[in-house]
Every structure is written in structure tokens, then in C-alpha cells.
Amino acid sequence: VNYQAVGSGSGRKAFIDETVHFGATDDPMKESDIAKVKRGMVQIPMTGGTIAFGYNNPGCDVKLTQQQAVEVALGIINNWSQVGCDDQKMLWVYRSDGSGTTAAFTNSMQSFSKTWTLGVGKSVGWPSGVGAKGNAGVAGVITNTPGAIGYVNQSYVKDKILAATIQNKSGQFVKP
């Protein structure tokens, strides 16, 4: 078995094109995609991965309300001083490829606040920031860019990447 983490969009295409025999995604296939699979398929629900706000600002313990999380992703909050850290420009990093991680992340952002304007999907029109391919690409940009913040699968929160805590509905700040 040779599994390649290429992102949900690329993985779906490879499965539909019959260049792979199986795949995994954070965003289940829709009927329109399933209809394109000529050989047939079985979709099996499984546990999803946790998504973290990963950041590179080692001197700051980041705690975001749900509204602040949305404002970071929209580029409204663009300086670390706006979330209680030292004055430093914040760089938003997002997935540039079609991604189940993006679909799950944007779904959360939409549930957090009515000010979320980008909708929900594997790809959205980010108003600012830098795109990178795959979780590994986003993690690479965050690791190599002081002040960067973005969304990644929790397994990428290591070394220079820290995880922000997010306030839940009951008011507690929790790590992913």
C-alpha cells in the first residue's frame, strides 16, 4: 500500500480517474462525484481529523474567541497586538488546493459567526494571505514565517508551530 496525502481535491480526481484504488477525505463525496466513478464505490464514514489554528509566534499564548478566529481568517485581525501579543504583522496561510480540511474549517467558521462571508467549501476566495498546497505546505509556510497563522491538521502542530486555543460555546478555551 502506498498512501499519498495529496489533499481531498487531488485525491477525488485520482479516484474518479481510476489512478488509485482508495482514498480518504475530511469532506464526504457528493452524489455528483459518486456518479462519475464508473467502477462503483463504497463510502465508509470514519473519524475526522482535528484542525488547529497553527501559528509561529513563540512568545505569545494565543487564545481566540470564535469571533476573533473568524476575523483572523478574514484578515480583519492582521496584527498580533489585536489578540494580546507584541506588535507584529500577522500573515494568514491557507490551503490553495481543493481540500476537505478547508471544507471542515470553513464549516466551523460559518458556525462561529454570521460575519463569516466566504461560505463553506473545499476552496474559497480568501481575501488576504498566502496559499500553500496541502497541510504540509501550509505547515511549511507557518514554520518558516515568523508571525504566520493558518489552519492545519493537528498532526502538523509541532516544532515551531504552536496551536491557538479557541473559546467553545460554553466559554472555555480549548486546544484542538
Regions found by a protein language model. Give the residues of each.
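Exported/periplasmic ABC-transporter solute-binding proteins
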Residues: V1-P176
